[in-house]
Structure formats: structure tokens, C-alpha cells
Amino acid sequence: MEWIQAAILGIVQGLTEFLPISSSAHIFIVGKLMGLGDPGAAFTAVSQLGTEAAVIVFFWRDIVRIIKHWGLSIAGKIPRNDPDARMGWLVVAGSIPIIVVGLFFQNAIEVTFRNLWIVATTLIVFGVILAVADAVGKHERKLEELTVKHGILYGLAQCLALIPGVSRSGGTITAGLLMGYTREAAARYSFLLAIPAVLGSGFYELFKIVAKHENAGDTFNLGQTALATVIAFVVGYLIIGWFLKFISHNSYRGFVWYRIALGLVVFVLLGFGVIPATLS
């Protein structure tokens, strides 16, 4: 991998992480079009630290308040039904499914699903599901109305993001819409819920690479990955603000059509042998 290619992948990561179009799918596809080997699950996980840092900076006031009140509720100094403390508990509850599924299906995640036929299929299928959710959802519930049950359902939907092409934000936002939440509420909880999962995955992959030299992929380079991570942070920060404003006045229809079109393009490229199906 050249430095310019790492920079391009960083831009792609930042542009796509928070949109319901799957950042991992775009990293795979763009990497293949540039003639790269598989950057690996490690590259994706570590570069996502940049976009997750963007979430933390963008929502830092909310996050600090949530953590503070959550800690006070644990100490018994404020009731657990305090709005911010409650959100902290909801993020914890929603994170349980991804921890369990990630631990038990790590090999399948890192090997079996890294195939462009799967990516193209999930882009289209989950694009259609997002369209249905956006059309039939009531768009009435606010973030303050989130329940533990719904938080766990969000968490189960987040597990689908372990399959390349589904999209972490796409899966959780779809779940939120189906449960009747507004587009903005669904997106905000999706972003907050992703923080523990992405940080945990990213730092774990980084530890394996630095300490154990595992799972580095064909083209992994720590310096280049660091560059991609920084670029992903800057671009991702800009995208968050734009996305939240956009969905407050628009539907997800444009993202749905984009997913379907991209999936079809990948099928065509695979069918004509322009790019290989396997990511190795």
C-alpha cells in the first residue's frame, strides 16, 4: 500500500462510516479497485478509531454528562432513572449483544464474510430493508423514550454490522425506524451505541498487531493506518454534522438507491472478472 492509497482509504472511511452505506464494504471495494491486497479486518477496525474519535469530539458534552451521571447512579448519589444516567445504562445494555456475538464468531467475521459476493448481496438486501423501515416507521418516538428492551434490540441490530456490507449505522438506524423512532433519534443512539463496540474492537486489533503481530492483512502498515485514521477523523467529523441536519428534513431514500446501485455495480464487476471475489 502506498501512502496516497492509505489517505484515500482514510477519506473513504470518514465519508462512509456514519452513513447507512457500509464503510467496510467501501474499504473492500475501493481497495480492490486500487489493486491492493486485503488491508484486513485490523485495518478497518483501527481506522474506525478515527471516526469514533470524531463522534466523541462531536458529542463530547453529551458523553461527559452521560458518563458523569452514570457513575453517580452507580454510586447511588442520583437515581438510575436520571435521563443521562439512564442513557448510560441503555448504552451498556445495547452493547452486550455485540460483545457476545463478536467473541463467539470472530473467525467467521474476519474470514468467512470477507467476500465481495456477500458484500454486494448485503448492500442490496439491507438497502431494501432500510427502505421498508423508513416507509413504515411512525417516526414519533424521541430518544428520551428509549427503553431497555429497545436498547437491546438496537444492540442485536448492531451485530449485523459484523457482516461486511450491512453497515453499523444502517443496521441500528433501521431497527430504530422499525421501532417508531424519529430519523434523528435513531441516528443519535446509533452513534452513541457504536462507541464502546468500535473502541473495543479497534484497540483490541491494535494490541494484536503491535504485541502479537496477528491479523495484519496483506498490506497493513502501522504508519499508513495511522494516517488513514487521522484523515478519517477529520472527514468523519464533518460528515456527522451534515448527516444529522440532512436526515432531520429528508428520508433515507437516497442512501437506499445508492446501496442498491453499488451492489449491482459490484455484481457486474465480479461477473466480468474485473475484481476478484475473495479479499485476499
Swiss-Prot record:
The keyword Transcription does not apply. One of its GO terms (molecular function) is undecaprenyl-diphosphatase activity. Keywords: Antibiotic resistance, Cell membrane, Cell shape, Cell wall biogenesis/degradation, Hydrolase, Membrane, Peptidoglycan synthesis, Transmembrane, Transmembrane helix. It catalyses: di-trans,octa-cis-undecaprenyl diphosphate + H2O = di-trans,octa-cis-undecaprenyl phosphate + phosphate + H(+). The chain crosses the membrane at residues 1-21, 40-60, 89-109, 116-136, 146-166, 191-211, 227-247, 260-280. InterPro entries: UppP. Its EC number is 3.6.1.27. It is a multi-pass membrane protein. GO terms for biological process: cell wall organization; peptidoglycan biosynthetic process; regulation of cell shape; response to antibiotic. Bacitracin is thought to be involved in the inhibition of peptidoglycan synthesis by sequestering undecaprenyl diphosphate, thereby reducing the pool of lipid carrier available. Belongs to the UppP family. HAMAP family: Undec_diphosphatase (MF_01006). This is Undecaprenyl-diphosphatase. It comes from Renibacterium salmoninarum (strain ATCC 33209 / DSM 20767 / JCM 11484 / NBRC 15589 / NCIMB 2235). The gene is uppP.
